[in-house]
Regions:
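Hydrophobic beta-strand residues of extracellular immunoglobulin-like
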Residues: 57-60, 122, 157
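Terminal substrate-recognition subdomain of acyl/acetyltransferases
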Residues: 155-165
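Short amphipathic helical patch at the helix-1/turn junction of helix-turn-helix
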Residues: 93, 126-127
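Acetyl-CoA-dependent GNAT
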Residues: 3-9, 14-96, 104-109, 113, ...
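Conserved active-site alpha-helix within GNAT-family acetyltransferase domains
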Residues: 100, 104, 128-145, 152-153
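Conserved GNAT acetyl-CoA-binding A-motif
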Residues: 114-125
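Structural motif
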Residues: 15, 116, 138-139
Length: 165
């Protein structure tokens, strides 16, 4: 586990595209997934990682020259979230590595790092993505009643967990 740097932008962009296509094949319209361009994703990630806000973190898991998964975290921008809440904005794993425990390890690290700075940690996922719901529930995150329409035409739900005392 390590903090991502600008040199990881290309690998994260390519992984994000593969992960979305695998994870959301039954959730999002095919044209949405087909429109994802790994080159554009890589450029966006390079830009973001080159000027990473001090409040944000991007964690990667894998050997030094590879990215098997990544998690992006930062403050939770939701007006209805508890004041000062943190959020895991994204968690993606190489599709072939799902079920190996790497996702749990990566998510646990990202959530624990957020809990150093935030009393409550939130995560959003597509409501139709039952696997994600079970994953977050096993990690102690419960539905908190918040939902919203996504820009992709499907509903997202929020889960949250309060830092242990």
């Amino acid at each position: 586990m390590r903090a991502a740097g600008p040199g990881d932008g290309r690998a994260i962009g390519a992984l994000a595209t593969r992960a979305w296509r695998a994870a959301y094949a039954r959730v999002l319209a095919p044209d949405v997934l087909d429109s994802m361009d790994p080159i554009e994703q890589a450029a966006d990630w390079l830009t973001y990682l080159s000027d990473l806000p001090a409040t944000d973190r991007v964690w990667v898991i894998g050997p030094p020259v590879e990215v098997w998964g990544f998690a992006r975290t930062g403050p939770c921008p939701d007006a209805d979230a508890p004041a000062g809440a943190g959020e895991v904005h994204g968690l993606y794993l190489e599709p072939a590595r799902i079920g190996t425990g790497l996702g749990r390890e990566l998510f646990a690290h990202a959530a624990a790092d957020l809990e150093i700075r935030h009393e409550v940690v939130c995560v959003w996922h597509f409501a139709a993505n039952d696997g994600a719901g079970r994953f977050y529930e096993r990690a102690g995150f419960a539905l908190d009643g918040a939902s919203r329409p996504s820009s992709f035409g499907v509903v997202e739900v929020r889960r949250s967990r309060r830092r242990a005392a």
